[in-house]
Amino acid sequence: MTHDLAASGLRFGIEEEFFLLDASDLDIVRSAPAGFVAACRDTLGEHFAEEMFECQVEVASPVFSTLAEAARFHGQARQRLAHLAMDFGLRSLCVGTHPFADWRRARSNPAAHFARLFEDQGRVARRSLVCGLHVHVEIPPSHDRMAVLQRVLPWLPLLLALSASSPFRGGRRSGLASYRRALCGEWPRMNIPPALPDEDAYRRHLALLRETGCIREDGQVWWMIRPSSHVPTLELRICDACPRLADALSLAGLFRALVGEALDADPRALPVARDACLEENYWQALRYGCAGRYLVEGRCVGAGDWLEMAWRQCRPQARRGNEWAYQHACGLLEETSAARQLRRYRRLREAGQERHPALRRLVEELLEENLQPALAG
């Protein structure tokens, strides 16, 4: 298979979150060992960040022009983080939810920024032991980010369905493809953004939230897609963390293509309007993943047809540099991470393994997937 990675798309960046596990039992650690965070900063530099729990870290990329650049950086970053973790008796795991970890064991990060989150959100924050994939796509200054957001928004449940990797919670099947997004729904300002027509309206809304004490800072608006508060991008936040790097790259490419199409669209021909079916499609993606039934253009379609519709509506300039992303996503329709985890778990139980050993083996397989090369061939 050859991969078209022409460097002519919008610039973008990717953020991946990881759990830190005890190498001996593959459960989350309460705290990282002394020296681990410093070693990560020495190795990954400004691209490494701590997260809201001490058993979590994040890798945030530089700015990319091509998916090939993203594959090289994140492939190396995953390897480096994994090797550092092993040096400290840990393993690093990229997945939406840990299959058997108990969230009550997770220790909150005492840094002031995170302490305020736990103070404000209480048990909602404590329960949110999840990892996500965030993708930033640069928006030219000549375009209004909120207008672009509203045009891209109806497609986001499709991206969630493709990314779903959190079917387990606390050692049990959750019944959802993305339990992570169900937990996100407990937070304020973390689901579907309001129908604000432009950035002026967005800024007025943020000012109201600040002035009334609803938020402490602009970054506390955590919608599933939002204008970044510090860089000129739209930030996709709906997706689960992807065990396989290739899946994360595919989602980044699809999002970049959809944003590119929204930028190129004639605003007179594409009015900003809220899709009445958005909430139902979001539930279908959260519950069923790619097996969901989606309401699109007045009819019910499967995820495969919806993905084809998304790609068809992107003009050549929006597709350019993202062709591989679409091809890979077509393969994801056959089996997402959530579906694969459930299939493997079922296979292990049918072979006679007890619940916990089967879940531990599932974590071992996810760790192996984390280090699979992307864009090979």
UniProtKB/Swiss-Prot annotation:
GO terms for molecular function: ATP binding; glutamate-cysteine ligase activity. It is an enzyme of class 6 (ligase). The keyword Metal-binding does not apply. GO terms for biological process: modified amino acid biosynthetic process. InterPro entries: GCL_type2/YbdK_subfam, GCS2, Gln_synth/guanido_kin_cat_dom, YbdK. It catalyses: L-cysteine + L-glutamate + ATP = gamma-L-glutamyl-L-cysteine + ADP + phosphate + H(+). Keywords: ATP-binding, Ligase, Nucleotide-binding. It comes from the Bacteria. The keyword Nucleotide-binding applies. Its EC number is 6.3.2.2. ATP-dependent carboxylate-amine ligase which exhibits weak glutamate--cysteine ligase activity. Belongs to the glutamate--cysteine ligase type 2 family. YbdK subfamily. This is Putative glutamate--cysteine ligase 2. It comes from Pseudomonas aeruginosa (strain LESB58).
